[in-house]
């Protein structure tokens, strides 16, 4: 059985997402299928600036940044599924439901984000996301994103 694996390197991710250091939280896309799912990776380094204060002597990736990494993965999936934004359009993180944190993410971890498309209704697209380290769930959530024109 052969699979058609789609990967994206950092150069391609930078073409899709507006985020830059220190807020770009997707290092590589491991696989995706347009309109269905995406698997991406974030390599967690002790050199990340937020570890200075979260927490000194016991660095833990802030949960909100785990969610942001999953949201960025949904953005990549959306762009690969329906195309890049038109001039004057933005893709907003519009909501989150059922967010659960299961275990901490620490420097040296390789966090895998798996996001799946659920549905689009009234301009909102709903995704399910899970983040894993060593095959164990560290976070899961349902996220909503909206594509809209700038005011």
Curated annotation (Swiss-Prot):
The keyword ATP-binding does not apply. The active site is at 54. Its main location: cytoplasm. GO terms for molecular function: (3R)-hydroxyacyl-[acyl-carrier-protein] dehydratase activity. It comes from the Bacteria. It is an enzyme of class 4 (lyase). It holds the Pfam family FabA. It catalyses: a (3R)-hydroxyacyl-[ACP] = a (2E)-enoyl-[ACP] + H2O. One of its GO terms (biological process) is lipid A biosynthetic process. One of its GO terms (cellular component) is cytoplasm. Its EC number is 4.2.1.59. Keywords: Cytoplasm, Lipid A biosynthesis, Lipid biosynthesis, Lipid metabolism, Lyase. InterPro entries: FabA_FabZ, FabZ, HotDog_dom_sf. It is found in: Cytoplasm. Involved in unsaturated fatty acids biosynthesis. Catalyzes the dehydration of short chain beta-hydroxyacyl-ACPs and long chain saturated and unsaturated beta-hydroxyacyl-ACPs. Belongs to the thioester dehydratase family. FabZ subfamily. This is 3-hydroxyacyl-[acyl-carrier-protein] dehydratase FabZ. It comes from Salmonella arizonae (strain ATCC BAA-731 / CDC346-86 / RSK2980). The gene is fabZ.
């Amino acid at each position: 059985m052969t699979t058609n694996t789609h990967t994206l390197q950092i150069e391609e991710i930078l073409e899709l997402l507006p985020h830059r250091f220190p807020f770009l939280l997707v290092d590589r896309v491991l696989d995706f299928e347009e309109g269905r799912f995406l698997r991406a990776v974030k390599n967690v380094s002790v050199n990340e600036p937020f570890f200075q204060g979260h927490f000194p002597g016991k660095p833990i990736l802030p949960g909100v940044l785990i969610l942001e990494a999953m949201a960025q993965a949904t953005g990549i999936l959306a762009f690969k599924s329906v195309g890049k934004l038109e001039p004057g359009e933005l893709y907003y993180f519009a909501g989150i439901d059922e967010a659960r944190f299961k275990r901490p993410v620490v420097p040296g971890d390789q966090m895998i984000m798996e996001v799946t498309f659920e549905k689009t209704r009234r301009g909102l697209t709903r995704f399910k996301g899970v983040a894993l380290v060593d095959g164990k769930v560290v976070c899961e959530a349902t996220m909503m994103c909206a594509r809209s024109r700038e005011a």
